[in-house]
Amino acid sequence: MPACIDSIRECLEGAAPSIVATCDTDGTPNASYASQVQYVDGQHVALSFQFFNKTRQNILANPRATAVVIDPFTVARYVLDLAYLRTETAGPLFESMKAKLAGIASHTGMAGVFRLLGSDVYQVLEIESVPGKQRPALPPGRSLLAAVRRAAQRLSGCTDLAALLDEALASLAAEF
C-alpha cells in the first residue's frame, strides 16, 4: 500500500506502544518497543530517541527501520517501512514529543527516568496491513484532536492579543 499515513492516524497518538525493528551493517536484527511513533505529516513520522542503544546505533549505520503500530480502537495492526532522515533536538516537534513522553512516564510511574534526547524523523515508504481479527471500525467522523492541533498551530504564530483573538475566532469557525 502506498505511504499515506493519514488513514492510520489513530495508530500514531501514543495509546499503544509500537515495535521497531532495525538491522546492523552485517544484517543482525534488533527489535524493541518504542514509547512514541508520532505523526509529523502525511509522509513522515517521528520516533522518540531516549537512549543511545542498539536501535540508535543501527539507525545511524543503516538508516532503514520497520515499525509495527496498532490502532487502539480496532486493534488493526500495520507495518511501516521507514527511512531515517534526521534527528531534531529542539523546536515544536521535539517539545511536543518531550511533553508526551513526560505524560507517559508520569502515568507509568517512571517520571524522571525517561528523557527525550531527540525526535528521529522518518519518511514512511510503505504501509502494509497485517491480517487478523479486528474490532469494528468507529463510525466515520472528524478528528477533533487534529482540528485542535491545527488551531493551536495557527494560534502559536500570534504576537499580540488582538491577533490572538482574531485567529482564535477564525480557527473556531474553520475547524469546529
Report each predicted region and the residues it spans:
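Short, basic/aromatic recognition patches
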Residues: 1-17
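A generic local secondary-structure boundary/capping motif
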Residues: 8-9, 35, 56, 107-113
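Solvent-exposed polar/charged
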Residues: 10-13, 61, 174
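Short beta-strand segments
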Residues: 13-49, 80, 171
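Short, structured beta-strand-loop surface elements
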Residues: 54-101
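Short, low-complexity N-terminal regulatory "tails/caps" that precede and couple sensory modules
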Residues: 91, 103-143
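Signal-transmission linkers at sensory-effector interfaces
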Residues: 133-162
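Helix-loop-beta substructure at the N-terminus of cytosolic sensory domains
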Residues: 158-176
